[in-house]
């Protein structure tokens, strides 16, 4: 049986909130050649929202998303770095799905 890709399959992430605005760009254009946009995944956005906006612990956020605390830590670290990079460098930020997300409905 052929294997697609390397390593283990990525576990599905439970996402409760899809952002209304998914594309952010600086009001004033940069001087010089434009830098490529920064891409943030729904997983990173959800980790940032749960921990920094809702005030959950990483353990609680992991349970809500159906992943380990370590996975939340990695997603959160990556999301924070991308937001800081966007602000400091004046770059675009685009939030996109990665393909391994499951949207949680209110009934669950």
Curated annotation (Swiss-Prot):
Covalent S-S links between cysteines: none
Matching SUPFAM superfamilies: Sigma3 and sigma4 domains of RNA polymerase sigma factors (SSF88659)
Protein family membership: Belongs to the UPF0251 family.
Domain of life: Archaea
Name of the featured protein: UPF0251 protein PF0620
Alphabetical list of InterPro entries matching this protein: RNA_pol_sigma_r3/r4-like (IPR013324), UPF0251 (IPR002852), WH-like_DNA-bd_sf (IPR036388)
